[in-house]
Amino acid sequence: MKMNELQHILNWMQSEFPHLERSFHDGKNEQGKQICNPTYGFGSYLQSYASKEGKNIFQIGIAQTKSGISIYLLGIRGKMDLPAVCQNIGKAKVTGYCISFRKMEDIDQSILHLAINEALNITNLY
């Protein structure tokens, strides 16, 4: 996967959802160890934890992976049937909160927009 595909998706997000706050997480823990892929974030979401206070994190995350791009929609688990919303998205793998694909041209961008918009509506960010 070339960096220009990631940049293409980030540019698309910024043009489609310009009001969302942007952030970046380098994927490292407090000790500096790489624990996940670097992720570009859009929006802000209060993640609740059973053991401690909540923490503000991005709601829409975009990460480059070995197999392509993953878009994470946080805060929708149990509130939105993402696979049903994305059933006609094209060449992508869709789980309960993640849409993974190789290139933007492999998917229907209007369905991706719909899924992100619905996720934002669930958490009142849109």
Region locations from a protein language model:
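Charge-dense, helix-prone N-terminal extensions
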Residues: M1-Y126
